[in-house]
Amino acid sequence: MYTLYILSLLCAFVTFSECKYPPGPIYPHRPIYPIQPVYPDHCPGVCYIACPNGNIHDRNGCPICRCRPDECTLPRKIGPCRASIPRYYFNFVTKRCELFFWGGCQPNKNNFETIYDCQGYCGYAERRYPYPYVKRTY
């Protein structure tokens, strides 16, 4: 518990300008335990609960990997209206952005106009690192 308290202090006082590395690729929420990445640009796929934004931090408390926003775990929502507007949603099961036809009203936050918006927000990283638990040796 003391470690989580120290991590929360680091998250509160270290600014991004002091950080060595930019944020890495986005991954879904994983079991919560602290872990240091093998490479600074590779996300190990876990989230600290000590930090309010759920980012993984390096030894200096700097963000190196952003966890997938909760919106990306929502199911697609067509809505009660009868329009047929092409939209994209992130399918949390297949780990891909997929096309669906939105009714035109009452969307949830997992509703994107383009596949690029969906991939940028919910993570295109699954194609590059489809198995975040597997340590690559090549």
Swiss-Prot record:
Q: In which tissues is it expressed?
A: Prismatic layer of shell (at protein level). Expressed primarily in the mantle with highest level in the mantle edge and lower level in the mantle pallium.
Under the cellular component aspect of Gene Ontology, which terms does the record hold? Answer: extracellular space
Q: Name one GO molecular function term.
A: serine-type endopeptidase inhibitor activity
The protein's UniProt keywords, in alphabetical order, are:
Disulfide bond, Protease inhibitor, Secreted, Serine protease inhibitor, Signal
Q: Which residues form the BPTI/Kunitz inhibitor domain?
A: 72-122
Q: List, alphabetically, the InterPro entries matched.
A: Antistasin-like, Hirudin/antistatin, Kunitz_BPTI, Kunitz_BPTI_sf, Prtase_inh_Kunz-CS, TFPI/VKTCI-like
Q: Subcellular location, in the record's words?
A: Secreted
Disulfide-bond pairs as recorded: C72-C122, C81-C105, C97-C118
Q: Which domain of life is it from?
A: Eukaryota
SMART domains given in the database record: KU
User: Which spans are transmembrane here?
Assistant: none
Signal sequence segment:
1-19
Q: This chain belongs to which protein, by name?
A: BPTI/Kunitz domain-containing protein 1
Q: Which organism is it from?
A: Pinctada maxima (Silver-lipped pearl oyster)
- Lineage of producing organism: Eukaryota, Metazoa, Spiralia, Lophotrochozoa, Mollusca
